[in-house]
UniProtKB/Swiss-Prot annotation:
Residues where Omega-N-methylarginine is found: R23, R30
Ranges for domain IF rod: 90-401
Post-translational modification Phosphoserine, affected residues: S56, S67, S103, S473, S503, S523, S532
Protein name, per record: Neurofilament light polypeptide
Keywords tagged on the record: Acetylation, Cell projection, Coiled coil, Cytoplasm, Cytoskeleton, Glycoprotein, Intermediate filament, Methylation, Phosphoprotein, Ubl conjugation
Phosphothreonine, modified sites: T520
Region annotated Coil 1A, chain positions: 94-125
Family matches, as SUPFAM superfamilies: Intermediate filament protein, coiled coil region
Length: 543
């Protein structure tokens, strides 16, 4: 920024208006005007004050004409010093305003970039979540599918429970059969024990019989031996008797017949005894053989019954073990199915909870984004309002600075006027001052125009030096030409306004002593005209 208030953010026409001229603040011009335009006066109070001073100067150009001759050089020097100090203050204030405005513009650019980024993110989110009802329908469809799956799992569980009840009934029947088989096994074991006991008794009886057979065989052998000995002894006796009979026969012939009779009797008796012994032995052996055969059949039947009982017991035991294994497998399968169903139900419930949480988080995120977007819109609107206010303020400053020199000189020379009841630095609040300020001479207008011309020439010289250091491009040359044209148009407009002011001053001198209400109306009309002219200039700048 140069010493003449040059700022790269502003156009040349705006820079021409920001010259180092003093600023005169008027706290209150007229009560009616301040109440009617309070909103605008909060941003453009210096503008209205300068315009009031300017009108005061233009209206009082005739009445103060004689008083100028009475001014001495000391007062003029003091006024010039005051004007210099005011210009210095104005320069500092303008630099501060330019810096603030530049910072505001940077802040606005930064916020616009952030707004663009957020709008892009919002657009992406809207595209991503363009149909929240579709997600809701998808979630609801998935929830319905999961509920149907849960119902199917419940139905399957009920079917498995029915099957489990049937298996439990089968198990109870098998357990009843098992108990019956256990009882029959115990009965068979009891009968087997009795059969074993009978077999043992039969074996003992057989052993006794075998012992008795052995003893009888020994007795038969002994009897045979005794019989043979007896036969031998009898034969010996017979031979001895025969010899003796022969001897007697020789002596007594009748003894041989007697010996034959005795031998025949003994032979008959021995044959009879042998036959009786053989018959008794045979009958006894037959009885023992029959009893042994009977006992053997009973033992064999008992053994067969025991083996059959063992086979049945083993088969029932295997069947019971198979039923137990099947029961355990079914219970294990049922437990696995229950665990699987519980796990599936818990997983489905977790999925439902997760989807509900995601839906809630998505809704909250959408609400947060909408709130942030609303906040950004509010901030953007506030910034737009603030920018519009600053634009209005800058337009008012542009309008005010075009007439600041006239107002400053008027406020400086107002110290020597007896019409004013107070200093120009105390606020210039009285209406009598405004009425007397209209009598200032017209040649101060030319002096102000000369100062503005000098300032513009200085700015153009500064721009020419900068252009030498940095050659302008085609676009910048076109912009400079446009700015020159705008400056010429503004100068023509200012000349027209000066001519209008002179004509208005002439009319005001003729009208002379009108009241404050007419002045207020005229000032409002002038302000409206200047506002329309400023808006036209702003529109031209924008174009």
């Amino acid at each position: 920024m140069s010493s003449f208030g040059y700022d790269p953010y502003f156009s040349t026409s705006y820079k021409r208006r920001y010259v180092e001229t003093p600023r005169v603040h008027i706290s209150s011009v007229r009560s009616g005007y301040s109440t009617a335009r309070s909103a605008y006066s909060s941003y453009s109070a210096p503008v209205s004050s300068s315009l009031s001073v300017r009108r005061s100067y233009s209206s009082s150009s005739g009445s103060l004409m004689p008083s100028l001759e009475n001014l001495d050089l000391s007062q003029v020097a003091a006024i010039s010093n005051d004007l210099k100090s005011i210009r210095t203050q104005e320069k500092a204030q303008l630099q501060d305003l330019n810096d603030r405005f530049a910072s505001f513009i940077e802040r606005v650019h930064e916020l616009e970039q952030q707004n663009k980024v957020l709008e892009a993110e919002l657009l992406v989110l809207r595209q991503k979540h363009s149909e929240p009802s579709r997600f809701r329908a998808l979630y609801e469809q998935e929830i319905r599918d999961l509920r149907l799956a849960a119902e199917d799992a419940t139905n399957e569980k009920q079917a498995l429970q029915g099957e489990r009840e049937g298996l439990e009934e089968t198990l109870r029947n098998l357990q009843a059969r098992y108990e019956e088989e256990v009882l029959s096994r115990e009965d068979a074991e009891g009968r087997l024990m009795e059969a074993r006991k009978g077999a043992d008794e039969a074996a003992l009886a057989r052993a006794e019989l075998e012992k008795r057979i052995d003893s009888l065989m020994d007795e038969i052998a002994f009897l045979k031996k005794v019989h043979e000995e007896e036969i031998a002894e009898l034969q010996a006796q017979i031979q001895y008797a025969q010899i003796s009979v022969e001897m007697d026969v020789s002596s007594k012939p009748d003894l041989s017949a007697a010996l034959k009779d005795i031998r025949a009797q003994y032979e008959k008796l021995a044959a009879k005894n042998m036959q009786n012994a053989e018959e008794w032995f045979k009958s006894r052996f037959t009885v023992l053989t029959e009893s042994a055969a009977k006992n053997t059949d009973a033992v064999r039947a008992a053994k067969d019954e025991v083996s059959e009982s063992r086979r049945l017991l083993k088969a029932k035991t295997l069947e019971i073990e198979a039923c137990r294994g099947m029961n355990e497998a079914l219970e294990k399968q049922l437990q696995e199915l229950e665990d699987k169903q519980n796990a599936d139900i818990s997983a489905m419930q977790d999925t439902i909870n997760k989807l509900e949480n995601e839906l809630r988080s998505t809704k909250s995120e959408m609400a947060r984004y909408l709130k942030e977007y609303q906040d950004l819109l509010n901030v953007k609107m506030a910034l737009d309002i603030e920018i519009a206010a600053y634009r209005k303020l800058l337009e008012g400053e542009e309008t005010r600075l075009s007439f600041t020199s006239v107002g400053s000189i008027t406020s400086g020379y107002s110290q020597s006027s007896q019409v004013f009841g107070r200093s120009a630095y105390s606020g210039l609040q009285s209406s009598s001052y405004l009425m007397s300020a209209r009598s200032f001479p017209a040649y101060y207008t030319s002096h102000v125009q000369e100062e503005q011309t000098e300032v513009e020439e200085t700015i153009e010289a500064t721009k020419a030096e900068e252009a030498k250091d940095e050659p302008p491009s085609e676009g910048e040359a076109e912009e400079e030409e446009k700015e020159k044209e705008e400056g010429e148009e503004e100068e023509g407009a200012e000349e027209e306004e000066a001519a209008k002011d002179e004509s208005e001053d002439t009319k005001e001198e003729e009208e002379g002593g009108e009241g404050e209400e007419e002045d207020t109306k005229e000032s409002e009309e002038e302000e409206k005209k200047e506002e329309s002219a400023g808006e036209e200039q702003v529109a031209k700048k924008k174009d």
